[in-house]
C-alpha cells in the first residue's frame, strides 16, 4: 500500500472515531449528567 493511502485511511479513521465519540458524549449515556444552562432562568429580554 502506498504511504499516502495509509495516511489518508488513518486520518479518516481518526476523524470518524472522534465524530462517533462526540455524538456518544452529546446524546448517549454521559449526556444525562449534563445540565442545561438555560433551564430555570427567566427571559430578560421582555424587561
Curated annotation (Swiss-Prot):
The chain crosses the membrane at residues 7-29. Disulfide bonds: none annotated. Keywords: Membrane, Plastid, Transmembrane, Transmembrane helix. It is a single-pass membrane protein. Its main location: plastid. The keyword Plastid applies. PANTHER family: PROTEIN PSBN (PTHR35326:SF3). This is Protein PsbN. It comes from Aneura mirabilis. The gene is psbN.
